[in-house]
């Protein structure tokens, strides 16, 4: 199965082309270039977009705009190519990169997105239950390094690849997918613009 996977929910937009579990190519770039990057990866692998069997997309939580960009791109590709889409949690993809690690995404406004008992939650960094010697990954772990480390958590170095939700893990978690219109974003809170007008 030839899968194009991408995630634009965080500051590091990632994309990967995966054939039956083998990574044919991947990039970290900008959300605005995700379709162009995908086309280049497909062509560099000697394929054409019509060869794709599945689109795997990060559904958040993360940046409201980033999640929308990713979902719009996935839905557009699915419609044009008549392929299924699999929505993958950005947190699950981060956790898949480092077995046993706790994913922590910066939610801005002094909050984080993380998994609590397997469920995505938005909370203050101080509300994160930190376990002694457990690894914490993601841009939120980096931003709140002091809070996490002073309570016994372990955070890989700033440049570690573990802090990026690499799309190869979205492909690994994807399964068969389904109709694009059934893939829903995971926001966990209202967008900033909506909150400002409320």
Where are these regions (language model features)?
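Oxyanion-binding and handling regions
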Residues: 1-22, 29-36, 86-198
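DPxDG-like acidic metal-binding loop motif
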Residues: 54-84
């Amino acid at each position: 199965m030839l899968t194009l996977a991408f995630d634009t929910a965080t500051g590091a937009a990632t994309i990967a082309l995966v054939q039956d579990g083998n990574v044919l190519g991947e990039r970290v770039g900008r959300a605005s270039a995700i379709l162009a990057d995908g086309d280049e990866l497909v062509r560099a692998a000697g394929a054409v977009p019509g060869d794709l069997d599945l689109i795997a997309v990060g559904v958040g939580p993360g940046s409201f705009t980033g999640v929308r960009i990713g979902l719009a791109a996935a839905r557009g590709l699915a419609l044009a190519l008549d392929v299924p889409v699999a929505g993958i949690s950005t947190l699950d993809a981060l956790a898949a990169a480092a077995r046993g690690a706790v994913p922590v995404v910066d939610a801005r406004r002094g909050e984080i997105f993380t998994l609590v008992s397997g469920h995505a939650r938005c909370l203050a960094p101080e509300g994160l239950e930190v376990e002694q010697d457990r690894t914490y990954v993601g841009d939120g772990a980096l931003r709140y390094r002091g809070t996490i480390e002073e309570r016994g958590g372990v955070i890989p170095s700033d440049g570690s690849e573990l802090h990026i939700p690499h799309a190869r893990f979205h492909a690994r978690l994807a399964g068969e997918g389904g109709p694009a219109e059934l893939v829903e974003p995971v926001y966990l809170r209202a967008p900033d613009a909506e909150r400002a007008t409320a």
